[in-house]
Amino acid sequence: MLRGGSGAVLMPSTPVEFMLELTPRARVDVIDVRGEVSSRYGDALSGYSRALCCSFHTTAGYLDQSVAARLNQSPDGVMPYIDVFRTMFPEGAGYEHDKIERRTELSAAQRPVEPLNADSHLAFMAGALRTCVSYLNRPGEPMSFIDLDGVHAGRPRTRRTSVIGYSEEETVATARLIVPVSGHRVESVNLKDPNLGVYAQCAELVRQHGVTKGRIRLSLAPGERHAGLTINEYETLLMRHDLGEVLRDPLRFMAEKAGHMLGNPRAIPAKTLNYAKYDLVRVFNRLVDALGLRESRVENILSRAIAMPASRFLRMKRSVSLLVSDREHTGHGHIVEGTYQSPILVQWHRGARQARVLDVTVTRFI
């Protein structure tokens, strides 16, 4: 941070980007990326008022600052919160995504080494983890990278994340897009599908306005209900089967997965979900404790939990952000993302028509 002759604080004039490789210590781990930046680059980030953190993975990411603040951005605060969603989606509970023999997109060489991680994908979406989050840059306050699948076959996986320090963010372009959906009640749409043209239009806006460091915010338009946005792997078995089952009947999904862990997927009859309801109350008690909610709110939350809709079961957001950077070609910004990342529109009830409206906002970091 610089100071002018009058003592006024002067912010750096150019955003700075730090690329980090992280090594998780366990399958589920919390890593302070601020500490990683400090240990490798000193106080180079401290002169900026904001920091954008971006994960390039579909089972590791960040929490919004409001949630992270409740949890104190520390392992002691974050882990109980994450454990709630790991309870909802236990590891190895017979998910369709984990039936590797059915994964036609995998090559013969990929199948033996593909991790069985449907639980991590679902916990990522349910727990409202994001791939791209902007934080107020408060030196000394952790910024937690939360990994839900950091170790495979006993070996830590290499994780990549980017941290951009910037002082201000200005809007340079907006647009409204229409995304067609099917007539099905439960639907997931890959917004990266070239046939939709979403990415092409976003890329053109970035090019027209010469954005080199910034982000693209995709938001559901006001009035769009029973839908959400996430960034994850758009794999058919995961999206159409595992996630689809959650959206259609969250309690039954929990019941069947709990039964599967007991060795009998049908241990809890579909017609009676008392066990699932009981487990759900316990889960929400843990969530309330993790977030430090006031006791006066607990009863209200739990009274709604028994008839909990998918919108509460999955804490999915109404917007996602895509990183724009010129780190690969200086002066030419483009969308930067992980190999398997796709923005996904999810609906759990039909809308008024077979389409959803998205608002696009392109911003530049300065």
Residue spans of the language-model regions?
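Active-site histidine-anchored catalytic micro-motif
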Residues: 2-366
